[in-house]
Amino acid sequence: MGNEFRVCDDCQATNVKTLIPKLKKVDSCATIEVGCQSYCGPGRKKSFAFVNNRPVAAPTEDELIVKIEAKLNK
């Protein structure tokens, strides 16, 4: 089973236009779902994505990608 990324296109700290290409570089075969994730509180302040149904957040997109890569390499 492949990885799954879920991101919000409405949260203030998440820029879907730049985040999705970065996620595709991490795993080009992953499923990417865009839409409200009901994670609005943290989503106002931090960039985030759900990785295989687990939330991962960081102050910047680049830090988020590092955390996602670490999570997938466990």
From Swiss-Prot:
Pfam families: DUF1450. InterPro entries: DUF1450, UPF0741. HAMAP family: UPF0741. Belongs to the UPF0741 family. This is UPF0741 protein BA_5632/GBAA_5632/BAS5234. It comes from Bacillus anthracis.
